[in-house]
Amino acid sequence: MRILGIDPGLRTTGFGVLERHGHKLVYVASGTIKSNGNADLPSRLKTLYDGVSELVSTYRPDCASIEKVFVNVNPQSTLLLGQARGAVICGLMSGNLPVFEYTALQLKQAVVGYGRANKDQVQEMVVRLLNLEGKPGADASDALGVAICHAHGGETLAAMAGLAPQLAQKGLRVRRGRLVG
């Protein structure tokens, strides 16, 4: 299975492509899509949409995984990030890809084994898990991390998270990937 991971951002959007063969992960590509900070917002969003659409047609992934938005202290920054995510998701959907979303906590737990890991720890584990010769940039590393998260059973985590309301009615919840009462 070929997975396209995305770390969305208005200025810089990271991407990472990997393949899962059984339990083995194979690095395919990574990099960034940059929008012109001097351009108007619609032009920047179109740059992201076009860039992601091109990635989909170039790498032909089976699915995509994307990091969820966190609420920032600055509401304007959160709004802009949400718009960037929207453009990216539309680009992914233009290729009819299934899109899976993961929180930073889920990503860190899947990659490092600790949900409060810092960016350097995530970057180092991405290098180790994919046998990379050098460190990818921070945005590309996060994108590879979200792809690794999906490859390591993220589909199950996403499905369980989607069941949260039904589980809560039964007095259950998901904690650290397990059902608890």
From Swiss-Prot:
Binding residue positions for Mg(2+) 1: D7, D139
Catalytic activity entry: Endonucleolytic cleavage at a junction such as a reciprocal single-stranded crossover between two homologous DNA duplexes (Holliday junction)
Cell compartment(s), UniProt: Cytoplasm
Enzyme Commission code: 3.1.21.10
Cofactor(s) it depends on: Mg(2+)
Stored CDD domains: RuvC
SUPFAM superfamilies: Ribonuclease H-like
Record-linked PROSITE patterns: RUVC (PS01321)
Keywords assigned: Cytoplasm, DNA damage, DNA recombination, DNA repair, DNA-binding, Endonuclease, Hydrolase, Magnesium, Metal-binding, Nuclease
InterPro entries attached to this UniProt entry: RNaseH-like_sf (IPR012337), RNaseH_sf (IPR036397), X-over_junc_endoDNase_Mg_BS (IPR020563), X-over_junc_endoDNase_RuvC (IPR002176)
Name of a matching Pfam family: RuvC
GO molecular function ontology, one term from the record: DNA binding
Positions that bind Mg(2+) 2: E67
Family per similarity comment: Belongs to the RuvC family.
Subunit structure, as described in the record: Homodimer which binds Holliday junction (HJ) DNA. The HJ becomes 2-fold symmetrical on binding to RuvC with unstacked arms; it has a different conformation from HJ DNA in complex with RuvA. In the full resolvosome a probable DNA-RuvA(4)-RuvB(12)-RuvC(2) complex forms which resolves the HJ.
Protein name in UniProt: Crossover junction endodeoxyribonuclease RuvC
Species of the source: Ralstonia pickettii (strain 12J)
